[in-house]
Amino acid sequence: MATRNEEILRKPDWLKIKLNTNDNYTGLKKMMREKNLHTVCEEAKCPNIHECWGARRTATFMILGAVCTRACRFCAVKTGLPNELDLNEPERVAESVELMNLKHVVITAVARDDLRDQGSNVYAETVRKVRERNPFTTIEILPSDMGGDYEALETLMASRPDILNHNIETVRRLTPRVRARATYDRTLQFLRRSKELQPDIPTKSSLMVGLGETMEEIYETMDDLRANDVDILTIGQYLQPSRKHLKVEKYYTPLEFGKMRKIAMEKGFKHCQAGPLVRSSYHADEQVNEAAKEKQRQGEEQLN
């Protein structure tokens, strides 16, 4: 009879990366602690943190606290009863973006189902503060589904991010097991309404694979996203954060990810990043529209 350890799939070589903890990375981590800020890069144990913080000048801040009101079975973020909102957080995030000299910033948040506005007002204020202090930094937001609250979504989109990112995470069949407090159709509705509110802002979603889905289900999910006018797709390998989380059912090869990307582009996505270590914010600075890219170029000119 197989033991628990034998049941866990062996991680393939292409998922083994060398961590480069340089002075830049160490300094940024120290600054985050001094300012009492959180990044999903750290909380979700992202394998790309060194590349993003160092070479690409991108980072993903996690606001509204460090405790999520949901307990999705794939996610490493702490769950439980959150603290009160920190109304000074928007200014601290904006200041940190400036000190880090970021080219592109992703602002995500824990789900705050305990709040009447789902945290949308502080979220929108964070976008505005970052924009005020960093006019050449492109901003991507990665919110929860806001409990399906349309007014909360309106508040978010009125802050005019450069990208709206909301993750489908997995295929329809697996959604109840993977993220019980969310629904597949509510995610699609959230993405569609975002585009209706601000048609010129690109929308984006991300899919984890390796949870037991079929290739046909992956392609059906692509079709559902395109039917709701989603522009950008990222696809990455699910990695089990701990023994308490869902186990990996399959490790996809780089060749299989290449095929997924090819199919996604054929289905009409403007951008698709697909690979074993791809995460929702991976190479996000490349995915903004032309107007936002011009803003990035102006910022580069000021640095030189």
From Swiss-Prot:
Top-rank taxon, per record: Bacteria
Stretches the record annotates as Disordered: 282-304
Keywords for this protein: 4Fe-4S, Cytoplasm, Iron, Iron-sulfur, Metal-binding, S-adenosyl-L-methionine, Transferase
GO CC, one annotated term: cytoplasm
UniProt similarity note: Belongs to the radical SAM superfamily. Lipoyl synthase family.
Record-linked InterPro entries: Aldolase_TIM (IPR013785), Elp3/MiaA/NifB-like_rSAM (IPR006638), LIAS_N (IPR031691), Lipoyl_synth (IPR003698), rSAM (IPR007197)
Entry's localization field: Cytoplasm
Residue numbers binding [4Fe-4S] cluster 1: C41, C46, C52, S281
Catalytic activity, reaction form: [[Fe-S] cluster scaffold protein carrying a second [4Fe-4S](2+) cluster] + N(6)-octanoyl-L-lysyl-[protein] + 2 oxidized [2Fe-2S]-[ferredoxin] + 2 S-adenosyl-L-methionine + 4 H(+) = [[Fe-S] cluster scaffold protein] + N(6)-[(R)-dihydrolipoyl]-L-lysyl-[protein] + 4 Fe(3+) + 2 hydrogen sulfide + 2 5'-deoxyadenosine + 2 L-methionine + 2 reduced [2Fe-2S]-[ferredoxin]
EC number: 2.8.1.8
The protein's name in its UniProt record: Lipoyl synthase
Biological pathway: Protein modification; protein lipoylation via endogenous pathway; protein N(6)-(lipoyl)lysine from octanoyl-[acyl-carrier-protein]
Extent of the signal sequence: none
Cofactor remark from the record: Binds 2 [4Fe-4S] clusters per subunit. One cluster is coordinated with 3 cysteines and an exchangeable S-adenosyl-L-methionine.
Gene label: lipA
GO MF terms, alphabetically ordered: 4 iron, 4 sulfur cluster binding; lipoate synthase activity; metal ion binding
Major location category of this protein: cytoplasm
Binding annotation for [4Fe-4S] cluster 2: C68, C72, C75
Domain spans labelled Radical SAM core: 54-270
Cofactor(s) listed in the protein's UniProt record: [4Fe-4S] cluster
